[in-house]
Regions:
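Charged, compositionally biased, marginally structured helical/coil segments
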Residues: 2-3, 46, 117-120, 136, ...
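Short, surface-exposed linear segments at secondary-structure transitions and domain or protein termini
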Residues: 32-34, 125-130, 217-225
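N-terminal, positively charged regions that mediate nucleic acid binding
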Residues: 1-74, 79-81, 159, 170
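Short acidic, Gly/Pro-enriched loop/turn segments at secondary-structure junctions
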Residues: 17-24, 129-133, 203-206
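Short, acidic Gly/Pro/Ser/Thr-rich loop/turn segments
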Residues: 14, 20, 125-126, 278-279
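Hydrophobic (often cysteine-bearing) scaffold residues that line and stabilize catalytic clefts
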Residues: 51-56, 93-97, 165-168, 222, ...
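SsDNA-processing nucleotidyl-transfer enzymes
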Residues: 61, 65-147
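Short acidic, glycine-rich loop/turn motifs
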Residues: 15, 105-113, 199-203
């Protein structure tokens, strides 16, 4: 029996702000545990949240960059659940009226462009962090991360392979760094993906039961987790079993997924509007100011390179996948180097070597002027 794979992704993007979503506490990473707690994130009685305007600006900036609907009025809601690293007993999020509505992000697969529809993007606060396996079998709670601003970006189930899911995650990762709303450090948890996977009979309009793989913080793990999960679901169904909607974790050491709990529905969280926060209103002036602050977007630069420099769509996509790479390329062009040769030398020779050596492109020992001089001699 042939199968179709159906994938949707929810991405938690930690916004690049100096203070938390609803307080003035610092968001810096790596400090002593529980040194950045505040009365709001610790849920002291009587304290009130104050919205971080910079986080709002980041959300609007993202929405504009994917040509999404920006809701001029959005509502904050309480998402109620119990977990030790969530002292309030609820998370402040957005539910029925998010700040960013429908948009799209285009990915390049086998030299063909595919649009992945973005359903919504909403502001929320992060929870704290639990550490298990400490001395004497104890667990610890670090609330430094609690209250950190997040933008959760939710797609429609438009992806049909692990390769498409990885292409989308990489494109989104590049975009949020390009527009300056996230530093993209996946090891520090600043960009985390929850991947919803299901399978259905080929050509059927009836969707299968989905399982959600939580907290994937590496493109390699996204692919491995999806490949394993798809094979597991198909084998389970073909052997006469059934799929239960659940939340699962991926173990990179074994390459396997394992069920963690049954998957919650929205009504399990008992959402209701947060009475401590007024509706968020976005004005025309806000929109204009933020739009003017946006850099040239990767898609715009890609089209310009294809039209003006006669690059192929593939080469233009490669060179605009990262702002540092694009700036390096533009520097070489300004020195008079051939566009096509510059792309080849940057992508094939220089940056592939930097990746192998785990050197950041900004720290490249070969500056664009040196490489341009070399290309001009060819």
């Amino acid at each position: 029996m042939d199968w179709d794979i159906v994938i949707g992704i929810e991405t938690h993007v930690q916004l690049k702000t100096k203070t938390k979503q609803f307080s003035g506490a610092s968001t810096s990473f790596g400090n002593e545990p529980n040194s950045q707690g505040c009365l709001v994130s610790l849920a002291y009685p009587g304290v009130l949240p104050v919205l971080n305007q910079e986080a709002v600006n980041c959300a609007i900036k993202f929405g504009l960059s994917i040509d999404a609907i920006i809701n001029r009025k959005s509502i904050f809601a309480r998402k109620n659940y119990f977990y030790p690293d969530l002292p309030k007993g609820y998370q402040i999020s957005q539910f029925e009226l998010p700040i960013v509505g429908e948009g799209k992000l285009s990915i390049l697969i086998d030299n063909h462009t595919k649009d992945v529809r973005i359903l919504r993007a909403h502001l929320e606060e992060d929870a704290g962090k639990s550490s298990h396996g400490l001395s004497h079998g104890k667990s610890g709670i670090d609330l430094n991360r609690a209250g950190t601003p997040l933008l959760e970006i939710v797609t429609e189930p438009d992806m049909s392979s692990a390769e498409e899911a990885v292409a989308y995650a990489k494109k989104l990762h590049d975009l949020v760094q390009w527009i300056g709303i996230c530093d993209g450090n996946m090891q520090e948890g600043n960009f985390r993906c929850d991947v919803n996977v299901s399978v259905k009979k080929k050509g059927s309009d009836v969707l299968g039961i989905r399982r959600e793989i939580k907290n994937l913080n590496s493109f390699k793990y996204i692919k491995q987790a999806i490949d394993y999960e798809v094979n597991w679901q198909i084998e389970t169904i073909e052997d006469g079993g059934f799929i239960e909607q659940s939340t699962i974790l991926f173990n990179p050491d074994t390459g396997e997924t394992k069920a963690m709990r049954s998957k919650e529905e929205a009504n399990d969280y008992r959402y209701f509007p947060d009475p401590d926060l007024l509706p968020l209103i976005v004005t025309d002036e806000d929109m204009l100011t933020i739009k003017d602050s946006l850099p040239e977007l990767p898609s715009e630069m890609q089209s310009r390179f294809v039209k003006d420099l006669k690059l192929s769509m593939y080469d233009a996509s490669e060179i605009t996948s990262n702002k540092d790479v694009a700036d390096y390329f533009i520097g070489m062009i300004n020195e008079g180097a051939s566009a096509k040769l510059s792309v080849n030398w940057i992508v094939v020779n220089l940056f592939s070597r930097l990746n192998d050596e785990e050197i950041n492109s900004l720290d490249s020992p070969v500056k664009f002027k040196k490489l341009a001089d070399l290309v001009l001699k060819i």
